[in-house]
């Protein structure tokens, strides 16, 4: 019982934390497609929509933005360092230097 409770606490902490805190910076990146590759990072490019309301499974994209002269600027000026795509019940909180886009459409995570 204690093990199950500990596992639930760890999962809750990971889901509620910043996208950077969840360890999204450790995966391999396909620079051509600007997307995380390899298990388990590609399994959420399309979310399972079989969740009953009020808990839909949404898609999110996390962009780490390069800084220009110590200041974060728009994506167009400095470009995205890399992009992570995944699924979550709630939108993750953007950490320092991150931009998070969340949506609930099956097509929104293809950008």
Swiss-Prot record:
**Gene Ontology MF term list:** acetylcholine receptor inhibitor activity; ion channel regulator activity; toxin activity
- The record places propeptide residues at 20-34
Signal peptide, first to last residue: 1-19
* GO cellular component terms, semicolon-separated: extracellular region
Task: Show the InterPro entries listed in the entry.
Answer: Snake_3FTx, Snake_toxin-like_sf, Snake_toxin_con_site, Toxin_cobra-type
Keywords linked to the UniProt accession: Acetylcholine receptor inhibiting toxin, Disulfide bond, Ion channel impairing toxin, Neurotoxin, Postsynaptic neurotoxin, Pyrrolidone carboxylic acid, Secreted, Signal, Toxin
Pyrrolidone carboxylic acid found at = 35
**Known CDD domains for this protein?**
TFP_snake_toxin
User: Where in the cell is the protein located?
Assistant: Secreted
Member of which family?
Answer: Belongs to the three-finger toxin family. Ancestral subfamily. Boigatoxin sub-subfamily.
One Pfam entry name: Toxin_cobra-type
Function of the protein: Potent postsynaptic neurotoxin. Displays readily reversible competitive antagonism at the nicotinic acetylcholine receptor (nAChR).
Which Cys pairs are S-S linked?
44-68, 47-87, 91-102, 103-108
Name the organs or tissues of expression. Answer: Expressed by the venom gland.
User: What is the protein's name according to its record?
Assistant: Toxin 3FTx-Tri3
């Amino acid at each position: 019982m204690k093990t199950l409770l500990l596992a639930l606490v760890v999962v809750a902490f990971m889901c509620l934390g910043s996208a950077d805190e969840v360890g999204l910076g450790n995966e391999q990146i396909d620079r051509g497609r600007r997307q995380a590759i390899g298990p388990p990072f590609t399994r959420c490019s399309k979310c399972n929509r079989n969740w009953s309301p009020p808990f839909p499974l949404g898609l999110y994209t996390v962009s780490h933005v390069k800084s220009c002269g110590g200041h974060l600027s728009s994506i167009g000026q400095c470009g995205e360092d890399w992009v992570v795509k995944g699924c979550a019940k709630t939108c993750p909180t953007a950490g320092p230097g991150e931009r998070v886009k969340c949506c609930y459409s099956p097509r929104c995570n293809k950008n």
